Amino acid sequence: MIKQFAVSLLLVLLTLVTTTASAERIRDLTTVQGVRENALIGYGLVVGLDGTGDQTTQTPFTTQSLSNMLSQLGITVPPGTNMQLKNVAAVMVTAKLPPFGRAGQNIDVVVSSLGNAKSLRGGTLLMTPLKGVDNQVYALAQGNILVGGAGASAGGSSVKVNQLAGGRISNGAVIERELPTQFGENGVLNLQLNNEDFSLAQQISDTINRTDGTGTATPLDARTVQLRMPRDKSAQVKFLSHVQNLTVRVDVGDAKVIVNSRTGSVVMNRNVMLDSCAVAQGNLSVIVDNQVVVSQPNTPLAGGSTVVTRNPAVAVREQNGALQQVNASASLSQVIQALNALGATPNDLMSILQAMESAGCLRAKLEII
């Protein structure tokens, strides 16, 4: 009997542990410091458009750019020439230089109209140097643009689906310069947590030290864990691959409510709880009605004139908001039921959540984005 009770108690404890923590790989919780993408940008011209390019009278930089490009190719445009081009558009080209990118590697580029071009569909991007923040050229972009939108116009009417003023070129740029990296220099590497958490940083450090020896990992702060690595490059890759595949028991995160003030969206995680409180909510509406009355003479021979008068009316309406009790809720489903019982719109719900937080009834961090 005692043995059965002990087994049952052990199963209950294991169930509680699995519900409050989950095993995740270190690679899903962290990133390697210094291993990141770098932004590239360039200015270029798109040609071959079917009459949907820039209006050069309104975008003089397009004509200037074309003249400069032609002069570099040995073609001189007479000064004062008014080039009316409809198949050329000035664009900005952006790309991401991947970590450990090598010369000759292809990367995707995004092409966006800079002027007033109607569409970039069917256009070809001419050779465009892509520079980094240090003003050095790291890649060259060129190729046919793929535009995901579609549109048509006739007789003054037009129809457009999605965006026509931007597109992508898959593998449209070639890396010409490699970015130097400091990966694993001096036998030290830092892992950066995706979210700052002192306990998680300590857990990651303890897990690595248990498998690779004491002193291998050291938590520096709530977001950084420092690793002591081999100095050989091949051994560093093997060591980091091993560390990233280690699993860590991750406790349940902080209770959090995210409110988007622009769209009215409200998102909660499963740890949000409510204390008992009473809520009253009501809307105040101001209605302005402007009625137009036309007065005309009864007979055309009376010599009167038609008079237009306006009768404005202003009314204020306030909806009654009785106090409603919100019961304490210990789970996300109960929180949803309690808030839905108020019958509040998303905009009202944002104000209610703020008031609940101020009153200490919302046991969660409220973030407004």
UniProtKB/Swiss-Prot annotation:
InterPro entries named among the record's database cross-references: Flag_FlgI
Cysteine-cysteine disulfides: none
Pfam family, one: FlgI
Subcellular location: Periplasm; Bacterial flagellum basal body
GO cellular component: bacterial-type flagellum basal body, distal rod, P ring; outer membrane-bounded periplasmic space
The organism's place on the tree of life at top rank: Bacteria
Signal peptide start-end: 1-23
A single BP term in Gene Ontology: bacterial-type flagellum-dependent cell motility
UniProt keyword Aminoacyl-tRNA synthetase, yes or no: no
UniProt keywords, alphabetically: Bacterial flagellum, Periplasm, Signal
GO molecular function: structural molecule activity
Main location: periplasm
Oligomer status and interactors: The basal body constitutes a major portion of the flagellar organelle and consists of four rings (L,P,S, and M) mounted on a central rod.
Function: Assembles around the rod to form the L-ring and probably protects the motor/basal body from shearing forces during rotation.
Similarity section: Belongs to the FlgI family.
Protein name stated in the entry: Flagellar P-ring protein
Classification lineage: Bacteria, Pseudomonadati, Pseudomonadota, Gammaproteobacteria, Enterobacterales
Gene: flgI
